[in-house]
Amino acid sequence: MPVVIIGGHTRSVGKTSVVAGLIAALPAFHWTALKITQYGHGVCSANGEACDCVTADHSLAVSEEKDRSGESDTSRFLVAGADHSWWVRTQQGHLAEAMPRIRKILATTQNAIIESNSILRFIKPDLYLTVLDPETADFKASAQTYLDRADAVLLHSVENSKTPAWERVSLKPVMDRPTFEIHPPTYVTPEVIEFVRARLSRFSPTSHH
C-alpha cells in the first residue's frame, strides 16, 4: 500500500489542490485522503475555534468527511474521487498522540495520500512532494526540516528576475530533485501525474473497490 505525502512551506500554496488533483487524475488507486491540521495554543481541536480548554480530550480530533459539497478541503478530496477522506486535528506539537488513530486508518486503506509536513517525523512515505511558492515569505520550520526528503518539487511559476521572498532558506537540499513548474489554478500538470504514476507503478493499482 503506497503512502503519498504532499507538503508545502506554508498555508495557501496549493497543497490541497495538489492532493485533489492527484486523486482525480489517478482514480484507479482508490485513495484514502487525510488532511492533518495542527492548531496553536488556545484553539480547540474539536472544532478549530478559540477556547481555553486544556483537557486531553480536546487536544485531538479525528473525523471522517461525509459531505460532498466541496466546501471544505476534506470535502474536496471526496468530490475529486477519494474513497474516504479524514480530517485529523491536533494541538501544535501533539501529532504523536494522533498517530495510533492515523496508523489504524492507514492499515485499512488501499492507497493513502496525506496533506502534511509534520507527519514525516513518524512515517516514511513512498513519495513526498513539496509545494513551494517563491512569492510567499513564510517558510514553516517543518517544511525546512524535511525539505531534503522531497522526491520532487512543485514550484509556483514566477518571473525569473524576482528574488524569492523567503529569508534564510536554502533550496540546496532539493537542487538535484525533479522540479515541476506549476501555474495556478492548474496545480497538477500531466508531467506531475506521470511522475507520480511512474513512482507508484510497482504497486499496480487494482481496478476494483
Locate the predicted segments by residue.
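Phosphate-binding/switch loop-helix module in NTP-utilizing enzymes
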Residues: S85-I119
